[in-house]
Amino acid sequence: MRLSLWNLLGLSGLVVASCPYMSGEDQEYHISHIQARGTDSEFLDQFKVEDSNSYLTTDAGGPIQDDASLKAGERGPTLLEDFIFRQKIQHFDHERVPERAVHARGAGAYGTFTSYADWTNITAASFLNSKGKETPVFVRFSTVAGSRGSADTVRDVHGFATRFYTDEGNFDIVGNNIPVFFIQDAILFPDLVHAVKPSPDSEIPQAATGHDSAWDFFSQQPSTLHTLFWAMSGHGIPRSYRHMDGFGVHTMRLVTDDGKSKLVKWHWKTKQGKASLVWEEAQILAGKNPDFHRQDLWDDINAGNGPEWELGVQIVDEEDVQAFGFDLLDPTKFLPEELVPVTILGKMKLTDNPTNYFAETEQVMFQPGHIVRGVDFSDDPLLQGRIYSYLDTQLNRNGGPNFEQLPVNRPRTKVHNNNRDGAGQMFIHTNKAPYSPNSLSGGNPKQANQTKGRGFFTAPSRKVVGSLHRGTASSFADVWSQPRMFYNSLIPSEQQFLVNAIRFEISQLKSDLIKKNTLMQLNRVSNDLATRVAAVIGYKPLDPSPEFYTNATTDYVTIFGKPLPSVVGFTVGILASTSSSTSISQAAQLATSFSSRGIRAVIVGESLLSGTDQTYSSADATAFDAVVVTMGAETLFGPVAKPNTLFPSGRPSQILHDAYRWGKPVGAVSKASVVLEPLPGTKNQGGVYRVESVNELATSIAKGLETFRFVDRFPLDS
């Protein structure tokens, strides 16, 4: 049996202790800087166009009429001289820009980051230099593989990119909701993307990996297994963007003003708690509401319930880069928090939706190369490639080098450099000596460095040794132990979800060779997992391959094993009947009670009469985090229900049954509790509430939402 990660640490003499930076004590900061505005609204307002009380104009500003083209005669051909027609059509023809190759489907929001303390003891980054300092941010969440028109709830890694508009320039953390990545070297990125994208002949399937080319690559490139396991778990189908953590993925450096550096891993920890959909629900949502995640984020911010995350770092001494049994430069590995706790630096709250999706969310252009004084790179080979690739792809999407001048990309500080011209240049430069060094302009703009002008500087501790080498570092070789640790760390229901997800994917493969290769790789992680997958696709169990089997676990990867700290923003479906005044009255009382807790309530009835929000014909259990039935609505359920032309037969029962099957809290008031009887195994199960009063039901459902999903309803492999 291979030694566990913990045993390796014990043998190496490593001491696992709490982080020395956890105290968060303020320290005197000797350099004063203007604090970046928290709201950022004044900066953006200068770019907004308000059309109230105005006339149409050309792009050149002349008033026009553009609802009819200029023709030769009443019924004649359109004239070439019709500059209004040509301008309108030409601009329309060029409205679309190249779609992002990955992360095309996304949603964004503005907010504010607030530092909890003066962190100048670990970094010279100005946005962390004082307690309470606020910095405007823009965040873009996304899926990875699908096109811009794909659904939100597909199974995928999810992007979590954050821009800090600091008072010393823009700083981007271009991360994901999963702490690791598929590959160790950026040179393999085109291969990864080509493999998971739709087939080049049929353009099928969209935003999905259940096809031969994806699993051919996964099984031939086992570095993908760790990220794949995260994606096949609940992390691949989050309940919302609000309910997922974020990670910088790469090891970076924080550097102090005097040049002392530490290795760090960035973490965003959701204040809402982690929550996930279940797979059948996610699939139905992709058809019923492909905008589910972006709508959830938009609605919550509009309601004043903008989500929050805490930003933290794991801090490691430079010399400990390989002290944990793996190499911190390997982006397919994560550092368990039991080994190095996360030091929480501050909090981000999202408060404002974009004014224009294209101008802001589509045109925002993140780059790992957007770093500021006090932050530095590591030698992670994936990171090194991303620094180049992200800049290059922005040039392609924007058609020129001036994309940083777009409003959403502009820093909130003055820009002074010798970059000139290019398509879409928006500045009028007055410096006649755009080169360095110069004497004609007094040497301006001057060079900024570690001691002058608070310039960016590379950590003095960085050094490179060794011969040129094309290949993967030997310290990156073990790509099976950490996927096993992840699998070990899931509760049984989550393990079953992961097994079922892989079964779903593998059962769609056509190639027997790819199936066999996949089982071989799974078996190197877990014989239990490989055996359970093999049973579904008709293969015999494999003998254990124990070289990388470890009993190591971590407490920080499970989703369903912990109660949520907040239920604000969840939605409860209240099933009522417009033919019963008691039902509608109870529904209104429940809605008021839920609203007081920050929970959305949707009253569903046969028609949109006063007191209802949605009809049964359009309602579905996927839209609700819990479902309750009011007294009087029981007549719409089961054998007593009369045929109704206002909604599909059995729809009220279907909503309740689906909610129960997907582990959601369900309940009913008094006589309506009869509708719960047909649900399988509900007599003593948690999350099923039979109560006599409206207040009791509201309290019970709110408590049940803290559990979120009652996973004991899902069967386990025997």
UniProtKB/Swiss-Prot annotation:
Transmembrane segments: none annotated. It is found in: Peroxisome matrix. Gene3D superfamilies: 1.20.1370.20, 3.40.50.880, Catalase core domain (2.40.180.10). Heme binds at residue 390. One of its GO terms (molecular function) is catalase activity. The keyword Metal-binding applies. Signal peptide: none annotated. SUPFAM superfamilies: Heme-dependent catalase-like. Keywords: Heme, Hydrogen peroxide, Iron, Metal-binding, Oxidoreductase, Peroxidase, Peroxisome. Its main location: other. Its EC number is 1.11.1.6. The active site is at residues 103, 176. It catalyses: 2 H2O2 = O2 + 2 H2O. It comes from the Eukaryota. GO terms for biological process: hydrogen peroxide catabolic process; response to oxidative stress. GO terms for cellular component: cytosol; peroxisomal matrix. Its cofactor is heme. Catalyzes the degradation of hydrogen peroxide (H(2)O(2)) generated by peroxisomal oxidases to water and oxygen, thereby protecting cells from the toxic effects of hydrogen peroxide. Belongs to the catalase family. PANTHER family: CATALASE, CATALASE B. This is Catalase.
